[in-house]
Amino acid sequence: MEMTRTVRAPRGTQLSCKGWQQEAALRMLMNNLDPEVAERPEELVVYGGSGKAARSWEAFDAIVKALRSLEDDETLLVQSGKPVAIFRTHRMAPRVLIANSNLVARWATWEHFWELERKGLMMFGQMTAGSWIYIGTQGILQGTYETFAEAARQHFGGSLKGRLALTAGLGGMGGAQPLAVTMNEGVAIVVEVDEARIQRRLDHRYLDRMTRSLDEALAWARESMAKGEPLSIGLLGNAATIYPEIVRRGVIPDVVTDQTSAHDPLNGYIPEGLSVQEAAKLRKADPDEYIRRAKASIVKHVQAMLDMQKAGAVVFDYGNNIRQQAYEEGLKDAFAFPGFVPAFIRPLFCEGKGPFRWVALSGDPEDIYKTDRAIMELFPENQSLRRWLEMAQKKVHFQGLPARICWLGYGERVKAGLKFNEMVASGELKAPIVIGRDHLDAGSVASPNRETEAMKDGSDAVADWPLLNALVNTAAGATWVSIHHGGGVGIGYSQHAGMVVVADGTEEARVRLERVLTTDPGMGVVRHVDAGYEKALQVARERGIRLPMYE
């Protein structure tokens, strides 16, 4: 392990590769491992328990070397974080194709994965860790903001003002929660076992305060709720201890969820009664005992969530598979509360809406502020988008290369991409822009306990859709395309695909952008048409998507 090595993406217009498409892949790989961005960069872990950018430092170095020598008509193949081949393809083909953590269905278990990982044959890519498009906590912030906003609309008249949200986990994903709640005018108590993670969110202004005392956290929360003021509190502790204690005291939060790394009971979730350091020792000394204790804690954690739901709280699973883990340990009504996608997000997916993100390769925040203005001018009628961008400018701390995210739908993404390409071509932006997204998107994931939970036609587990998404984006000329397994919810529970396309100001980039930013969100609309959603069919007809079964 190379404890002292620091990786940071180059900035500016000087190329170290043979073209901007390759340079973009190189910089985004390096950006994933920037200490400002990654959770444990010395171990190549970006976020999500054990989501890595490369399999080993040797593999990382080989990827960097390959990208620097890659021609404009060649494609690099990466298998679970290791570069395995370079083939001559053509200029409009992707420069990199990535497959991470994919296992044949019968062997798709954490136990088999860990065995392969120990042998150095595989790595866990999460969603955007192994596909080189993680942008830090902002990457999930707008989705988290939209989720809490929709909960507020459905249950609390449109705002969380004077309301308490209880959640846990301040890692790369969960770290967005406190700011998302305060952006919705609410009060958040976020339980986190790792003090360093709480400190990081304080440093980045995602979190307002920290305490070790539940009494103090509740006192602060009550005071802010009474005044109708937003406040976020990081509470040092274990959710498996704190949640049941809150139930015991008869305190009923308005909203309850969780974003601990419960999807991974070995490398993610920390059992009750252990410090981070003690957990690390037990994990190494007796992994089976560690998993047993983690799962017992998860059962207590979920039982408390069920108790709060019965007492009147709005409770939802925030996509970490915690219900499944508890169910497998014998908690039979673990699925009594819904996942966040069917509860709040699916109507957006029917329009091909999802987390469109972009990164300024110049390293200059001003390039992002210029693109913010361009987006507001492109969609002047979208007031919630304007509100989001204005809030993001004030409150979001850039991690690594400056980046932005906003949810855009079919027809909108292509307009944005072409506008960015024009801005690069004219010199308004100092360097090219990288455009990507989370794998959590409308048409790029099969995950029956998360994105495709409770599909109208029962097609929750059909994994053809993310594969078609990757294939069509490859055909359309994305700069790099990835197919992953297990992201978000753990090995055995999801299949998903990612794409990145670069706006470098050229005519070639314009063609790529026009195709990819149409096919990619188009798959989201099509997937939901096929599942029987009327809204998706209406969108497809209005916007001219060809559907052979409807022609």
Curated annotation (Swiss-Prot):
Q: What is this protein called?
A: Urocanate hydratase
Q: Which UniProt keywords apply?
A: Cytoplasm, Histidine metabolism, Lyase, NAD
Textual note on the cofactor:
Binds 1 NAD(+) per subunit.
Pathway recorded for this protein: Amino-acid degradation; L-histidine degradation into L-glutamate; N-formimidoyl-L-glutamate from L-histidine: step 2/3
**How would you classify this enzyme at the top EC level?**
lyase
* Catalyzed reaction equations: 4-imidazolone-5-propanoate = trans-urocanate + H2O
Source species:
Symbiobacterium thermophilum (strain DSM 24528 / JCM 14929 / IAM 14863 / T)
What does the UniProt record say this protein does?
Catalyzes the conversion of urocanate to 4-imidazolone-5-propionate.
Q: Which residues form the signal peptide?
A: none
